Amino acid sequence: LVRGYHAVILRYSVEPARYPLALLQLAKSVAFLRKNAAEFHIDTNKIVLQGFSAGGHLAASLGVFWKKDFIAQTLGVTSDMVKPNGMILSYPVITSGEFAHTGSFECLLGEDYNDLDKRKEQSLEFQVSKDTPTTFLWHTVTDDCVPVENSLLFFNALRKFEIPVEMHLYPVSYTHLTLPTILR
């Protein structure tokens, strides 16, 4: 923070809430930061989302869906107000296909989980476009919860659209890898 970084934690709705509530909450938060950037000394060209696991799906969802009319219309803002400038996706849930973390999609979609079109819409490797922001991905190859293929699929989709992307793959996964207690 001493170097000018700001960190904001969003406590978004989870089960029993369903799509698109958490997405709208995240979009509203980004719009709030943009609207109040001067007060909070935020560079509006550097609003970067970070999400882990299912939170990675949420962050990536705003990255691929920010231009969808329903978001701006629901929130009463322009699409540019909710656009992330970049994403850091940490072992993200991406695909509802072969390498899915099924529980995440069941929670996200609820009764709509069996609707294959809705599941495919939430399979974010199919939603990447030229408007998806720069992305940093990291994952562990041996992740036994969210398969590494989730990051690989998103990486390949970003490459198809020539979106700047960097990915780090680590060979071994540890429980609670992102917690500082692993260093003790």
Which stretches of residues belong to each language-model region?
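Conserved alpha/beta-hydrolase "acid-adjacent" motif
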Residues: C145-N150
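Short beta-strand/loop motif that positions the catalytic acidic residue
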Residues: L137-H139
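Conserved small/polar residues in nucleotide/adenosyl-binding loops
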Residues: T175-T181
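Short amphipathic alpha-helix adjacent to the substrate-entry channel of hydrolases
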Residues: L1-V8
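Catalytic histidine neighborhood in serine/cysteine hydrolases
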Residues: R159-Y174
